[in-house]
Design a protein with these regions (language model features):
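Hydrophobic transmembrane alpha-helices of secondary-active transporters
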Residues: 35, 105-132, 268-271, 288-310
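Interfacial helix-loop-helix linkers and transmembrane-helix boundary segments
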Residues: 40-49, 69, 104, 125-140, ...
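Alpha-helical membrane segments and immediately flanking helix-loop junctions
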Residues: 107-112, 120-128, 139-151, 155, ...
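Alpha-helical transmembrane segments
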Residues: 191-208, 319-328, 350-353
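N-terminal alpha-helical transmembrane segments of multi-pass membrane transport
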Residues: 1-77, 81-83, 96
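Transmembrane helical segments that form the transport core of multi-pass membrane transport proteins
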Residues: 246-334
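Membrane-embedded hairpin module used as a gating/binding unit in multi-pass transport
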Residues: 200-276
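Entry/N-cap segments of selected transmembrane alpha helices
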Residues: 22, 128-153, 198-200, 306-332, ...
């Protein structure tokens, strides 16, 4: 029997690892099945959960004993997927010849390119009308929705993280996945994998989780406000093009550390408004779809048992939840404020759209309003603070990266 088992190194690897890691590995395999299933059923975000679930399931199944790239004379448990711990150029070259996902990881994740590609795609599907027509209102709603980004920083320091790690974790409150990737690469490379995985796990739950927060904090009579007295100013394509190039230039000038993200986002917007069909197809159907697929799959492949048993992982899960919860509460408080200032003309649910998970939080706000009042079509109004949230999150992230590096 032992000889038969030894033919299958994946099974043998269970006996070569600590008990807690073996248990975590089994749990993660089933968790991968769950992510895939709930993504397929549209309970969780399918674009992320389906590839991530496949990655989590298969990477934890495919563990075996193999030579250590750093010291080939030693053996270690690993996979044939990728190694996120390689550092020197020689190790990178050797890893690319062993791990099939290593080239994609090294050339798109390690330098933040994947975040820029996602941002370009998001820009290409973003409608700016309400934001440009009502910039003050949009920003008034977006700033309170950064509550988690501000408050999670001191909480993370209190829980034992250094300022650079705390700032990276705090960006989860902005609910902007590419921004979290960017911040963790700049500030806390040692926690890049767990922070990225935790952020995208929670972001995939936003669509199903925030409705419970909304129903707990906002009575039906407010949720059903139809905003019929509000109008959306029609903005011409020329105005959007001018806005994109001017604002992108100013933001890059003020916050050059985040210039790659600003450039990517506003280039996507310019592609959309220029109406060049080939560019629009390329940015949306190819770049955004392809980068989202590889983002989800590689993040899933990074979620191996050794990451889960990392002592800081439990703290990261707590802090990620706190960050998104506080941002959701802050967004709704901002929504209540503008509802009061407008004497009930504005639905407070547009406030939660300031949490910049584009366009998920805007869709959540619209869905919850529409459930109460079928005439409450607030999606166009929610997109304003949604886009403003992207900009405020980028600015706060740039401030964290610039200032915290000096500590």
């Amino acid at each position: 029997m032992e000889q038969i088992i030894n033919v299958f190194p994946g099974l043998v690897s269970f006996t070569q690892m600590p008990m807690e890691m073996a248990i975590a590995r089994i749990v993660l395999i089933f968790m991968g099945f769950g992510m895939l299933y709930f993504g397929y059923k549209d309970v969780l975000e399918p674009l992320l959960m389906i590839p991530m679930g496949v990655g989590v399931c298969l990477v934890n199944a495919g563990i075996l004993m193999m030579p250590d790239l750093i010291d080939p004379s030693k053996q270690k448990l690993g996979t044939m997927f990728l190694d996120s711990m390689v550092q020197t150029s020689d190790q990178h070259i050797n890893a690319m010849q062993v791990y099939f996902l290593q080239p994609i990881y090294a050339l798109t994740f390690s330098n933040g390119l994947i975040a820029c590609m996602v941002f370009l795609g998001i820009g290409a599907i973003t409608e700016l009308d309400f934001f440009i027509g009502n910039p003050k209102l949009s920003l008034m709603l977006a700033i309170p929705a950064e509550l988690g980004t501000f408050l999670t920083f001191p909480i993370a320091i209190w829980m034992g993280f250094n300022p650079r790690e705390a700032a990276s974790i705090a960006t989860i409150g902005g609910a902007d996945g590419p921004m979290v990737l960017f911040a963790s690469l700049k500030l806390a490379k040692n926690l890049f994998v767990p922070i990225s995985v935790v952020s995208y796990l929670y972001l995939s739950i936003v669509y199903s989780g925030y409705p419970f927060l909304i129903k707990a904090l906002v009575p039906k009579r407010f949720r059903g406000i139809a905003m019929k007295e509000m109008t959306i100013t029609k903005v011409s394509a020329e105005e959007k093009l001018a806005f994109s190039i001017v604002v992108g230039t100013v933001l890059s000038l003020l916050f050059p550390v985040a210039a790659p993200l600003f450039v990517s986002f506003f280039l996507g917007v310019i592609i959309r408004e220029s109406k060049v069909s080939r560019y629009m197809f390329f940015a949306d159907d190819i770049i955004l779809t392809g980068s989202t697929l590889f983002l989800g799959f590689i993040l899933g492949c990074l979620l191996s048992a050794d990451v889960v048993v990392e002592p800081k992982m439990f703290k990261l899960l707590i802090l990620g939840f706190i960050a998104l919860f506080l941002s959701g509460v802050g967004g709704l408080l901002g929504g209540y404020a503008v509802c009061w200032l407008s004497r009930g003309k504005i639905n407070p649910l547009v406030g939660i759209a300031g949490v910049s998970c584009v366009p998920s939080t805007a869709k959540v706000a619209h869905k919850c309003a529409n459930e109460v009042n079928e005439e409450a079509f607030i999606l166009p109004f929610a997109m304003g603070p949604n886009i403003a949230g992207v900009i405020t999150t980028a600015i706060i992230t740039a401030c964290y990266v610039t200032k915290v590096q000096l500590l």
